[in-house]
Amino acid sequence: MSLIPSSIRLLRLLPALSSTSVLMFALDEHLIFGTWMHPTLRERANTTLPPWWTKGGLRWRWVIIIGYPLTYLLGILNLLVARDELQATGSTLWYTTGLLFSIAHMAYVGTALNWIANIENGMPKGNVTYSMGNWLKMNWTRALITDLPAWVCFITAALKVL
């Protein structure tokens, strides 16, 4: 197998891999951050969450800063490289739809940043878990509406073309 066909096959698979990582990150956020909502932890969470989120955000933000743009780039590259192959296998629609679902994740940025600001600033005072609960609901909804369908589309596209 020559380098060019192998490279194209790898390119076809990469959006599925990158969207898997961002979907897993969203699931990890839900599982790990949701622990703060347990009734036995709420009182401590209301004082600990603001600094924890502020410090943690500096550590995990790279997943978002790299993961989504990488998925966009890989989706676009797939639509541009060996387009006749995509057309012949019916994968063009799947890569396009996966890309659009992935981009749709950013429609939630304003809402997400508002809830995050509330958490980091300890708002509402004495009940930060209220903001955390709302962020968790928004994050789960966003994952189900954007990240999961993007992942399914990219997996389907790769399976059709490979």
Swiss-Prot record:
Location within or outside the cell: Membrane
Sample GO molecular function, one term: oxidoreductase activity
Principal cellular location given in the protein's record: membrane
Superkingdom of origin: Eukaryota
Keyword field contains rRNA processing: no
Transmembrane regions listed in the UniProt entry: 62-82, 99-119, 142-162
Glycosylated position list: 46, 127, 139
Annotated signal sequence range: 1-19
Membrane topology: Multi-pass membrane protein
GO CC term, one of those recorded: membrane
Protein's UniProt keywords contain Nucleus: no
Keywords: Glycoprotein, Membrane, Oxidoreductase, Signal, Transmembrane, Transmembrane helix
Inactivation phenotype: Abolishes the production of xenoacremones A and B.
EC number, as in UniProt: 1.14.-.-
Cystine crosslinks: none
Pathway given in the UniProt record: Mycotoxin biosynthesis
Enzyme class, broadest EC rank: oxidoreductase
Function: Epoxidase, part of the gene cluster that mediates the biosynthesis of xenoacremones such as xenoacremone A, a compound that shows inhibitory activity toward the PI3K/AKT signaling pathway and which has the ability to induce apoptosis of A549 lung cancer cells. Within the pathway, cooperation of the hybrid PKS-NRPS xenE and the trans-acting enoyl reductase xenG is responsible for the formation of the reduced tyrosine-nonaketide derivative. The alpha/beta hydrolase xenA then accelerates intramolecular nucleophilic attack to give a pyrrolidone derivative.
UniProt record similarity statement: Belongs to the epoxidase xenD family.
Name under which the protein is recorded: Epoxidase xenD
Organism encoding this protein: Xenoacremonium sinensis (Endophyte fungus)
Gene: xenD
